[in-house]
UniProtKB/Swiss-Prot annotation:
Negative regulator of class I heat shock genes (grpE-dnaK-dnaJ and groELS operons). Prevents heat-shock induction of these operons. This is Heat-inducible transcription repressor HrcA. Keywords: Repressor, Stress response, Transcription, Transcription regulation. InterPro entries: GAF-like_dom_sf, HrcA, HrcA_C, WH-like_DNA-bd_sf, WH_DNA-bd_sf, WHTH_transcript_rep_HrcA_IDD. HAMAP family: HrcA. It comes from the Bacteria. Belongs to the HrcA family. It comes from Chlorobium phaeobacteroides (strain DSM 266 / SMG 266 / 2430). One of its GO terms (biological process) is negative regulation of DNA-templated transcription. Signal peptide: none annotated. SUPFAM superfamilies: GAF domain-like, Winged helix' DNA-binding domain. GO terms for molecular function: DNA binding. It holds the Pfam family HrcA. Disulfide bonds: none annotated.
Length: 357
């Protein structure tokens, strides 16, 4: 049975409880609301509203406290139908703009440096664990390749992909080759493969070079090695994390076992990356100011160790490819601030990566 929609009074009380709890981390009582929130309601009336919200699962009463705390259901309703997303404040804008501006102006930032910087700034501003995923490369367009012969049987291959990412691989050859042969193969590969996606290259490289395979030993080696050369970068190599210290300082992590579980989770980088990559909108009601931001709360997360956490993420785009920015923290999170920071950071990151590259 679906829950009924809340009336205005219930929405107001639920919103106040969540906002107060986010700030204080302490259960919120009816007396606090009556005295501080100017709703024009008596303490008794507010208690009745809170009782209804508790009966329907939006708030709960921890142990013997007279106050109430939000549940996952309460946070979900708040995010979808009550939350107001304010703009990033001037101080935060200055910090973000200065950090990215320096990388762009000095032209000293590689894509990796920009992504790591984004993770550090996002963690510092959100006071949560921040995660940045570089774009997946399966649908990235191959631009050009270069080969540098390190010895007669050792070669460095440099791939340029959509002017965004340079992928470098050192390969041990099973044959001896000359610089002249390398130069000819580079020209041929760039002529035949430029403009294709990495996925297309992996699937069709044998066919596209079939007329060259009979007597071109280096071409044969490239075809045999296509899975390594043009493969998707493993997701853990696309992951940048910062801000773990901000999380363990929060009240939710006072118990050592909570800290231990959290550290264990973030040490499993594959799981963290997948949590952010797979994060999606869990409600059909999309808040207009959320844009492409996805929020999964508590037990909506697939990982058991993330059942007490919220994941907020948004995509960023560069060169037709999509990466992701994410924040992981306790469900007691300033959701409006998280959304506004992610939206602004995504715009800045897209612009900076385009300029740096």
């Amino acid at each position: 049975m679906e829950s009924r929609d809340l009336n205005l009074r219930e929405r107001q009380v639920l919103g106040i409880i969540i906002q107060a709890y986010v700030v204080s981390a302490a259960p919120v009582g009816s007396r606090y609301i009556a005295r501080n929130c100017n709703l024009g309601l008596s303490d008794a009336t507010i208690r009745n509203v809170m009782a209804d919200l508790e009966d329907e699962g939006y708030i709960s009463q921890p142990h013997t406290s007279a106050g109430r705390t939000p549940t996952d259901k309460g946070y979900r309703y708040y995010v979808d139908l009550i939350m107001k997303v304010r703009r990033v404040n001037d101080e935060e804008k200055k910090r973000i703009d200065a950090d990215f501006g320096q990388l762009t102006t000095e032209r000293r930032g590689s894509s990796s440096e920009v992504l790591l910087s984004a993770a550090k700034v996002l963690g510092s501003i959100s006071r949560q664990l921040s995660v940045v995923l570089s774009p997946a490369l399966s649908n990235a367009v191959f631009e050009k390749l270069d080969m540098v012969l390190l010895s007669s049987t050792r070669m460095m291959v440099i791939l340029s992909i959509q002017s965004l990412i340079v992928k470098t691989i050192v390969m041990e050859l099973d044959l001896a080759v000359s610089r002249q042969e390398v130069s000819g193969v580079v020209d041929l590969l760039n002529q035949r493969l430029s403009g294709l996606t990495l996925s297309e290259i992996r699937k069709t490289i044998s066919m596209r070079l079939s007329d060259c395979l009979a007597d071109a030993s280096l071409i044969n080696f490239v075809v045999r090695s296509a899975g390594q050369l043009f493969d998707e970068t493993p997701i853990i190599e696309r992951l940048y994390i910062s801000g773990a210290g901000y999380i363990v300082d929060q009240p939710e992590f006072k118990q050592p076992e909570k800290v231990r579980d959290f550290i264990t989770m973030i040490e499993d980088k594959f799981s963290v990356a997948k949590l952010v990559e797979r994060n999606r909108i869990y409600s059909e009601t999309v808040h207009p100011s959320r844009m492409e931001v996805s929020i999964s709360i508590g037990k909506e997360n697939r990982e058991r160790k993330a059942e007490d956490l919220t994941i907020v993420s948004t995509p960023y785009y560069v060169g037709g490819m999509m990466g992701k920015l994410g924040i992981l923290g306790p469900t007691r999170m300033d959701y409006g601030h998280a959304v506004s920071v992610l939206n602004y950071m995504a715009d800045c990151l897209s612009a900076t990566l385009s300029e740096v590259n």
